[in-house]
Amino acid sequence: MSDISPQDQARILSEALPHMQQYDEETIVIKYGGHAMGEEHLAREFARDIVLLEQTAINPVVVHGGGPQIATMLGRLGIKSEFAAGLRITDASAIEIVEMVLAGSINKQIVSHINAAGGKAVGLSGKDGNMVTAVKATRTMIDPDSNIEKVIDLGFVGEPDKVDLALLNQLIGHELIPVLAPLAVSTDGQTYNVNADTFAGAVAGALRAKRLLLLTDVAGVLDKSKKLIPELSIKDARRLIADGTISGGMIPKVETCIYALEAGVEGVVILDGKTPHAVLLELFTNQGTGTLIYK
């Protein structure tokens, strides 16, 4: 804010007050990923913004991805990355690397950034305290040669089955900031890699969060002329999926939004994590940013 006059700084803070009051003591789940996580200056800005939320009596819960970092590490080790239905096929050798990168390197880096900014973050995965239990994910696709539907074996890729809030509520109650890697465990102890958007949606739904923010590399949901759609109801979102306006990788993100809303989240926003202070712009300004999806 160095280029802003003191008077404008005061006005901005004053205008943010009703928004801060709206979110007082509420839980906000933020899915953090994409290029915003890979660029150091954006990563540090994000950490400061998370600390600011906590300092204004908001309970932030961070869920992070790590696809590019996983791909880089697998490549270094000579393990080929394969995808099906938008999900990384994760075999026995890959799941160890995925866990190392997500729960080790990335998670602890985010925790360090938040703590350096004055927060008290705790890094965990869904395995800790059996927080998130998962079942094996299944997908089908049509074989182009035979035109027969086939089941795809995704390996150790899971979908959330149950979220136990005991540990999360303890952390939030002690004013700690949970930073969660999207790993889960099955009832027989098997580790599963879970899509970060899906993981965040499950956690937000279980917490009945005030907001779920999905930080991406795009401005939000776009119409057919590539213009941002500021707001969508669930009904509108389903219609845009059906007519092809929402397509490709945006479909599972919007489906996660719908799931979270139906599970009790008040509002979900898809926004561009590359925008400086995107989280603050969404929560503390009248205009907001990205696409708000609501019931």
Swiss-Prot record:
Keywords, in A-Z order: Amino-acid biosynthesis, Arginine biosynthesis, ATP-binding, Cytoplasm, Kinase, Nucleotide-binding, Transferase
CDD domains named among the record's database cross-references: AAK_NAGK-C
Gene3D superfamilies, per the entry: Acetylglutamate kinase-like
Domain of life: Bacteria
E.C. number(s) listed in UniProt: 2.7.2.8
Binding-site positions, substrate: G66, G67, R88, N193
Pathway(s) of this molecule: Amino-acid biosynthesis; L-arginine biosynthesis; N(2)-acetyl-L-ornithine from L-glutamate: step 2/4
Cellular compartment(s): Cytoplasm
Catalyzed chemical reaction(s): N-acetyl-L-glutamate + ATP = N-acetyl-L-glutamyl 5-phosphate + ADP
A Pfam short name: AA_kinase
GO BP terms, alphabetized: arginine biosynthetic process via ornithine; L-arginine biosynthetic process
Molecular-function GO terms, alphabetical: acetylglutamate kinase activity; ATP binding
PANTHER family: N-ACETYLGLUTAMATE SYNTHASE (PTHR23342), N-ACETYLGLUTAMATE SYNTHASE, MITOCHONDRIAL (PTHR23342:SF0)
Family: Belongs to the acetylglutamate kinase family. ArgB subfamily.
Protein name per UniProt: Acetylglutamate kinase
Organism, as annotated: Afipia carboxidovorans (strain ATCC 49405 / DSM 1227 / KCTC 32145 / OM5) (Oligotropha carboxidovorans)
Gene name for this UniProt entry: argB
